[in-house]
Amino acid sequence: MTINLLDGIILKSVTQILAELFPDKYEGIPDYILEEKARYGTEIHRFIEVIEKKKPKRPIAYIKKYFKPSVYQIESLKEYLRLKKEYNIEVLESEKRVVYKNYYAGTLNIKGLVNNESAIIDVKTTYELDDVYVSFQNSLYEMADEPVKKLYCLWLPKGHRGKLVEVKRINKKVLKKLIGEKK
């Protein structure tokens, strides 16, 4: 867990805010399964960050050489690269830390262009896509950073074909009420 500090003040994370908004999201799922899913997703995020920062000519070969990805992770990375090409995704920043005043902080996955339009993209490896959750997540990231044209989820479910899904932007008034901002 990351502790978000701003001038000595501990800030909530976007994940903590969402856990309060969706308290039953993972109800009934055993901890060991949640931990395994989190580990898998974290590794996919790390591999994507490495690909985007190192820009190897042969990304899959590079990841195989320096890491130990599973067969499923390799397939997810192939899907990532396919979607990146299909939607002309240009990654400008990855794993960018953002802070909204003294209310919250978080790490947005990808800031870039999708078909030449500015976007925030969250990468998910979940079995089912929860677009409402991702809408709130990306809207909070956008409010902490700067406006973009569109918000997306790059969904890479384990063992299945990936998708780039546009998600709705949540109204700023709703977000400010959620975080307790009075203005």
What is the predicted role of each segment?
Residues 1-105:
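Metal-dependent nuclease catalytic cores that hydrolyze phosphodiester bonds in DNA/RNA
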Residues 96-180:
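Nucleic-acid nuclease catalytic cores
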